[in-house]
């Protein structure tokens, strides 16, 4: 009974120590292992976003319930990440804890982060090809493809400051969800701990750079390569989505959101909690 109570009431310092050990373990993996795990994470993130798009495809975007249900569905991607132990860029920035401990150099940390990001992109690209050739874009009278276009278009009109801020808040929620999952004794505990923070960031429209690497390039592909029957079913045209270009995506969304994600995860969660709970440790 005492051991059980001790576990339930263990100090946040222990969670910080667990997070730091996990960070060091991730960095210690081989480059091939890191890349393959990151590819899996990219696939899982795309799966979660596909579930989200399938739910909102034929629903009014103004309905709060739609955002809530869509957010809950999106958590599938993060549940798969937690269960399978893969590496997502936005959570891997927490490995900065290992740098502050002196376990690794900045060069090692940067190489690991870039490798994870490239692996995430490769996984997303593979799953995107499957989605494209599956014909899902044309399903429900092209409503699925239209949902992709509108979702991506809405992400392209934020200012730089807005994108950074939305990125900070997003990865704050993602990394806090991961931090909370360290408290769980069972798989169910970990999943339940993650649901609300992830649902919050999705329902609130916060920006996640890896999720955006799926939906925005996919929308750009639809804009340029969708066949005429798609636009007929959609009662629209490619000219209605002028913001969906590669250059605009990189400058207006990807880079500022990635910067915000790094700040939210590496600074506001990892470094902050390490300074609070582990600063006095040797």
Curated annotation (Swiss-Prot):
The stretch of residues making up the signal peptide is none
Per the record, a Pfam family? Form_Nir_trans
* InterPro entries assigned to the protein according to its UniProt record, in alphabetical order: Aquaporin-like (IPR023271), For/NO2_transpt (IPR000292), For/NO2_transpt_CS (IPR024002)
* Topological category with respect to the lipid bilayer: Multi-pass membrane protein
Question: Which Gene3D superfamilies has this protein been placed in?
Answer: Glycerol uptake facilitator protein (1.20.1080.10)
| Main localization category | membrane
Q: What is this protein called?
A: Formate channel FocB
- Please report the organism this UniProt entry assigns to the protein: Escherichia coli (strain K12)
Organism taxonomic ancestry: Bacteria, Pseudomonadati, Pseudomonadota, Gammaproteobacteria, Enterobacterales
